[in-house]
UniProtKB/Swiss-Prot annotation:
The keyword Cytoplasm does not apply. Belongs to the NqrDE/RnfAE family. The lineage of its organism: Bacteria, Pseudomonadati, Pseudomonadota, Gammaproteobacteria, Aeromonadales. This is Na(+)-translocating NADH-quinone reductase subunit E. It comes from Aeromonas hydrophila subsp. hydrophila (strain ATCC 7966 / DSM 30187 / BCRC 13018 / CCUG 14551 / JCM 1027 / KCTC 2358 / NCIMB 9240 / NCTC 8049). GO terms for cellular component: Gram-negative-bacterium-type cell wall; plasma membrane. The keyword DNA-binding does not apply.
Length: 198
């Protein structure tokens, strides 16, 4: 149990997809203007990561891995296209559910919801799962943790950006300029967790 708690904390803070690996920065910067919208997208990313990472773990280990189906048959060269297909299917299901049950959030996310399909944070989480050879339970924990870490980063960024609306930012830095500086400072803050060994 301690191993799984360690993995969860590591994936949220130490190996944060947004602020340690800089994955998913396009949506991170574009949707982090309001906390409410950032929270909605963060929850969507958690849901997709929590389902996509373990689902792709099963597909990789029981279909694509060398010798999974038949001895001597290695289908791992199909892993990227398979992972993207699974992620796309999950995002479509999530999009339909949000449209039906949460239309305000669906409209607020706009084009960025379908872009979760090609969000490199989602694909990065799946790729790290394969690279680190996680088992099924580890992949569930890692999916939840990496999604929660990305959500933590985008909600914190949205909160800071909302406060910066009332600040006197120099004209040349307004907009994305100060946002990039803020993201860099947040990443420096998260680097302080890198010395922690769990």
């Amino acid at each position: 149990m301690e191993h799984y708690i360690s993995l969860l904390i590591r994936s949220i803070f130490i190996e944060n997809l947004a602020l340690s690996f800089f994955l998913g920065m396009c949506t991170f910067l574009a949707v982090s203007k309001k906390v409410k919208t950032a929270m909605g997208l963060g929850i969507a990313v958690i849901v997709v990561q929590t389902v996509a990472v373990p689902a792709n773990n099963l597909i990789y280990n029981y279909v694509l891995k060398d010798g999974a189906l038949v001895s001597g048959l290695d289908l791992s060269f199909l892993s990227f296209i398979t992972f993207i297909g699974v992620i796309a299917a999950l995002v479509q299901i999530l999009e339909m559910a949000l449209d039906k049950y949460f239309p305000a959030l669906y409209n607020a996310l706009g084009i960025f919801l379908p872009l979760i399909t090609v969000n490199c944070a989602i694909f990065g989480g799946v790729s790290f799962m394969v690279q680190r050879d996680y088992n099924f339970v580890e992949s569930v924990v890692y999916g939840v943790g990496s999604g929660a870490g990305w959500m933590l980063a985008i909600v914190a960024m949205a909160g800071i950006r909302e406060k910066m609306k009332y600040s006197d930012v120099p004209e040349g830095l307004r907009g994305l300029g100060i946002t990039f500086i803020t993201a860099g400072l947040m990443a420096l803050g998260f680097m302080s967790f890198s010395g922690i060994s769990l």
